[in-house]
Amino acid sequence: MMLNDVRPAIGAKKRKKRVGCGESSGHGKTSGRGHKGQKARAGGSIRIGFEGGQMPLIRRIPKRGFNNKLFHVFYAPVNLSALQGIQQEVIDESLLRQIGVVKGKWDGIKILGKGEITQAYTFKVHAVSASAKEKIEKAGGKIELIKSTP
């Protein structure tokens, strides 16, 4: 097959609907808009949810609840088990991203207590769980909490 033999699949190219081009075309006179009325006029589209002046459904039903997700802080969870064998003494976000423990967009880092830790590390993170704090201090490590900026 040569490049000049390539043709689009049947039905792949659809002709534009030409309206107002004579009665026999099937789209003449009113151009498929029917007779009179708001939808027949130019710019005669009505917004979504408009019910002709009647109180719209979205305003008729009661409003309930509240959420504060806009201000929620999403921490990247890091377990102590993931930190085994790290040679550096100071563990911060840049190091965790460099070794691939933390990936993606997060508001901060939270150290969780799953696993054991033997070496004394200094953690510069945004949050620490109670069990992780206990294990870190037991191993002789320190925790420096960073204030997270959402």
Curated annotation (Swiss-Prot):
GO terms for biological process: translation. InterPro entries: Ribosomal_uL15, Ribosomal_uL15/eL18, Ribosomal_uL15/eL18_sf, Ribosomal_uL15_bac-type. Disulfide bonds: none annotated. GO terms for cellular component: cytosolic large ribosomal subunit. It comes from the Bacteria. Keywords: Ribonucleoprotein, Ribosomal protein, RNA-binding, rRNA-binding. Part of the 50S ribosomal subunit. Belongs to the universal ribosomal protein uL15 family. This is Large ribosomal subunit protein uL15. It comes from Methylacidiphilum infernorum (isolate V4) (Methylokorus infernorum (strain V4)).
